[in-house]
Structure formats: C-alpha cells, structure tokens
Amino acid sequence: MNSGVTSLDLADLAVHVFTASEEDFLINSLVFELAEELLVVDAQMFVPDAREFADLIEGLGKPVRQFVLSHNHPDHFLGFEELCRRFPGVPIAALPGVIDYVERLGAEIVRNRKAELGDLVASRAIVPDTTLAPGEQRIGGIRFRFEGFDDAEAESQVVIHLPDHATMAVFDLACRAEHHCFTVLPQFDHWLEVLRHLREEAGDVRHLIVGHGLPTDTSALGATIEYGTVAKQVYGEVRGADEYAAAMKERFPGRGQQKWIEFSALLLYRVIYP
C-alpha cells in the first residue's frame, strides 16, 4: 500500500487522514479542515512522508491555526521539523507529559534514529511550545473535546472527540482489528481501563481514527481490549522480546503487520530505548 488520503465529509467540517505507506508503518497524520483555517495533528516520522503531508496541507489553501502532537512517540513527532519549515510560526500544542518527554529525550531519539536511518529522519526534534489543556474548546465554530491519558499505550496521549460529528481520534490507544497493535509499555492494566472507558464514552461514534491505518469504527476498541488482554498474559509468561513477538503472532495468526509486533517488542523490553 502506498501513502494515501482518506477524507471524512462531516458537513461543516472535513477531516483528512494522511496515511503513510505500509513500508512506513501506515502512520497517520490528520488535518481538521474548518471553514477558514486548519488544525493539524501529528507530523509523520520519515522526511518524505512529512513532505508529502505538508503538500496536502498547502493544497487545502487555508492557514494553519495550530499543530497538535497527540502523544510522545517519534513516529508522530519527528516530521515536525519539516512541517515547521514549511509553515513557520505555527504553534505546536501537546499535553504537559508529551512536552516533557520530547524535551528530555527528543535529541537522543534523533541521534539514535539518524544513526540507523540517515536522512530519512529529521535532524532535530521540535519541542512543542504550547500546553494543550484537556477539556472542551470551540475552534472555528466546531466543538472539540480533548481528553488526556497517562501511562497507557504511551506515556502521555490525547484523545480528540468531535461530539457533534460522531467522530473520535484515539491515535495509538487502539488499532484496527486486522492489525497487530503497538505494545510498547508494560502498563497493560491501565491501558485496558482507558480502552473500556473510551468504549463506554463512544456512544453513537461512527468514525474512529487510529494512529496507524485507515479510519475504522468503534469495534476496534473491543478488538484492542482483546489484544491487550492477551498481551498482558503473554508478557507475564515469556522471557524477552523474541519470545513475546512469537507468542503474539501465534495467538493472533490472522492479524497482519507482523513487523509492528516485532518492533514494539524491542521497545517493550527496552532493547530499543528511547
């Protein structure tokens, strides 16, 4: 699968989901297209994808009000170097825990990834400069609700609710039912609590936007709860990243993107850190 764009037409709002190629982990970045401006969330990992995403933003022909970083994983923030070059002066908002993480570890992450991937990744990590406050905001006349969670799938993560548009962006907290999930922190109990909370909140949500792969529906929350429950059990039974990845592939033979579980196992067991 090559990179592509899925656009959700929600009457007075459009949500454009840029999805990187399968080779590049199907990473998602979002543009909320409002009547007169854009709210842009996440920036990709690889420079070519960030450039292509910037082209999408530019092609919409509206000013960018703000960037938002959904969580502290580098596959969602390294591309901000390119976006900030293309759209100078736009503030980047994130939860306090996300800002702290990028500030403390961003430079080391860039060094490590650049040693492996060279010019495919950014030369520096851009630290968000604006604190994202949880709660409800009206942006361009549209009601947004930002909800923050710590120590679940990531150290710090926001969920974006569009209460009037039956849409929720949960990013890496959930994955599509046919994919392996990224399990990079051993905080399984709390992650599962968060997922159950989101499932209860979902109500009439029709569009669920995940961090990797095409938009889906709320069935992905239940599928991720099932996956996380098994992941917790496997993590308690095996020794090391290789055994963990092998066991998860055996338990979920029908799920694709096996390299995702192999890579996330390296992070889960701190073979790769940060």
Task: Please identify what each model-predicted range represents.
Residues 2-17, 133-134, 140-144:
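Short Gly/Thr-rich strand-loop-strand
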Residues 5-59, 158-172:
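Conserved beta-strand hairpin/beta-sheet module of binuclear metal-dependent hydrolase folds
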Residues 20-22, 126-128, 148-151:
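Short Gly/Pro-enriched turn/cap motifs at secondary-structure boundaries
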Residues 39-42, 66-70, 145-146:
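Short catalytic-loop micro-motif centered on adjacent basic/acidic residues
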Residues 45-46, 150-226, 230:
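Metallo-beta-lactamase
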Residues 55-136, 236:
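Active-site HxH/HxHxD metal-binding segment of metal-dependent hydrolases
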Residues 201-205, 214-274:
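Accessory terminal helices/loops
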